[in-house]
Amino acid sequence: NRAAEFANLTAETAAALAESLRTGYAYPAAALHRNWELTLLNQFHDILPGSALGEVYEVSQQQYGEILASDARITDDALHTVAALVKTDRPGVVVFNQLGFARDTVVRVACGASGITDDGHPLPCHTENGALTFVAKDLPAKGWRFYPFADAEPETPCAEVTENDGGYIIDTPLYHIVFNGCGEITALLDKEAGRELIPAGQCANELQLFEDRPDEYDAWNLEKYYRRHRFALDGAARLTVAENSPVCCRLHLERAISRSQLVQDITLYPHSRRIDFATHIDWREQHVLLKAAFPVDICADRAQYDIQFGSIARDTHTNTSWDEARFEVCAHKWADLSEPGYGAALLNDGRYGYDVHDGVLRLSLLRAATYPDPHADQGAHDFTYALLPHLGDWRQGGVILAGYDLNAPALPLAVAAQPAGTLPAAYSQFRIDAPNVVLETVKKAEDGSGLILRLYESWGTRTRAALALPD
């Protein structure tokens, strides 16, 4: 569902950009309308939460495949149309940013090059298996930037890595982190803040498995008693260093979770505070709940949760009956726990269940109900969640942008030298001068009369903002 929503938004943005630049591209209104209709159909109240019959999900998976394939074609056609007109004096990469924020982000593109620059300055990059991975800096909002290829620079590791009793101690420009052999974080020193994030004796990225047997309505309900029935996870685990390049330091974890097998890539970046946990799991359980827990040394009685076009604060205690009933709550891209001056967010790209209590951020990863579908959620799953320690609260800490960045990777296209191109090397279709105003949607009006922009104020504060339109 999340992937379809963002694919629709990206396709709309790309198509609107290509047509508005008078490239000869025609906005595919009918196809986009169909993609949104199918997305909304699959948000029916039994399909979306996983409480429908198994046969329903056979159709649903097929329809999601149609949505994603159609959006990919639209996006690819639109961006290739634009990229072919960007004026360049040598080969390189045009990176498109579909978000309403300017950003620095990691991109990967298949090409034969081994180096890349920005205004003559070499960018951190890494080559592997015919692909170039680099940090695209200063990407304009709702636009693109061209990065020319260059000769390879020596690849300097971004982290100092030391083996430590089956795990690793990793020093990056931002963090000093200790991982045990299960991929859990036993210590995290934030160098800029000068503080330890993980409480002594506890572990972050702790995978927790609970018994999950509701009194009734197996796929619908989660009972609060589940917390009293936790299973020990003592399966084999193996942690190795997969990459230590100028772009990132990546650990590779293979671990048994009861009868299931988990593979996880844990990635730290020198340019970003985000720590990613890209997860693949072959799920073979019944009547259990899997969560990822992140205890943090942060004192706050309220947590902030991302919702549609905003966020909402909820208590982290159970002093009232209604707070006690919120032992599990819904959120979209992130949940954040902050005290004055510092905080931590737990981001995701497609999980919706959170609980934040007693200084622990937890994200529900998978369940294993057997009614009405006896095979619900069995098989392969791929998702990413991320920890984002930050200065300030969720507003000053860039949590909103980080949530969008995780869910909407930038889009790179390799191009040849195009000296006859008519479009600039860097371009922003729309820009906003207020960090709390989010431009989420750019689409063609349903009657074809112009473009529609959907913006929202994200901090809950009065704001005066200027929207810069294209020339």
Predicted regions and their residues:
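Metal- or metallocofactor-binding catalytic centers and their adjacent structured scaffolds
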Residues: 1-91, 402, 406-409
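C-terminal (or distal) subdomains of carbohydrate-active enzymes
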Residues: 65-69, 76, 80-471
